[in-house]
Amino acid sequence: MQQQRHIKWLLIFSTISMLFLNAQTANAHCQVPCGIFDDYARIKIMLEHAVTVDKATDLINELADKTDAQSQNQLVRWVINKEEHAEDIISIISSYFLAQRVKTTQKDYEKRLLEHHAVMVSAMKVKQNVDTKLVDKLIQDINALIKYYPEHEHKEGENKKK
């Protein structure tokens, strides 16, 4: 029993250490500005990250009670994976949308700001928890942004200066 507790603390410490050592920010496009935007693509990318967080959350919950080394190894890997994907969502919202696409001159600026902030808060909460309801809320919050960034076709040369 004491050995299991020691292993569990070692895994927790290892997980936390890996998260800090591997901390990176996701690049959500440039801030040159280049004038090339594909907002809908970034929404889809965030949804893909959220689905990955959902899968990671399910697997973390499945592996939580297992004590064999392989299961504990997989548990740590899924925790790290969940953290990285949630952090990527936060980075896309802050570095791309809030820095470049949400403008103070927009008539609905406050509403947009609140809805984008809600995505960041939801992503933070899924990092802190393994509750699938929080993942559902994250997906719902991301989907709430689609109305601002509908899918459209890019024409060849659309962003080139003449």
Model features per residue range: what roles?
Residues 26-70:
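Immediate post-signal-peptide N-terminus of mature secreted/exported proteins
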Residues 43, 117-162:
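C-terminal amphipathic alpha-helix
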Residues 17-25:
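C-terminal segment of classical bacterial N-terminal signal peptides
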Residues 85-127:
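Long, amphipathic, charge-rich alpha-helical segments that form helical bundles/coiled-coils
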Residues 73-81, 109-113, 135-141:
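Short, charged, amphipathic alpha-helical segments
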Residues 56-96:
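Alpha-helical segments in soluble extracytoplasmic regions
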Residues 31-48, 92-94, 113, 117-124, ...:
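Metal- and O2-centered redox machinery and metal/ROS homeostasis
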Residues 2-12:
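Bacterial N-terminal signal peptides that target proteins for export
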